[in-house]
């Protein structure tokens, strides 16, 4: 059996770790352009 809850937590954690810095960089670039 596959434990979807654990997989979901791992995927969400990985997504946050990847998207977090990307969002910060995008916000920094937008502020820099303004």
Curated annotation (Swiss-Prot):
List the record's Gene Ontology CC terms alphabetically: chloroplast thylakoid membrane; photosystem II
Any one of the GO BP annotations: photosynthesis
Its transmembrane ranges are 6-26
Question: What keywords is this UniProt entry annotated with?
Answer: Chloroplast, Membrane, Photosynthesis, Photosystem II, Plastid, Thylakoid, Transmembrane, Transmembrane helix
Q: Where in the cell is it found?
A: Plastid, Chloroplast thylakoid membrane
The record's note on quaternary structure and interaction partners says: PSII is composed of 1 copy each of membrane proteins PsbA, PsbB, PsbC, PsbD, PsbE, PsbF, PsbH, PsbI, PsbJ, PsbK, PsbL, PsbM, PsbT, PsbX, PsbY, PsbZ, Psb30/Ycf12, peripheral proteins of the oxygen-evolving complex and a large number of cofactors. It forms dimeric complexes.
The entry's protein name is Photosystem II reaction center protein Psb30
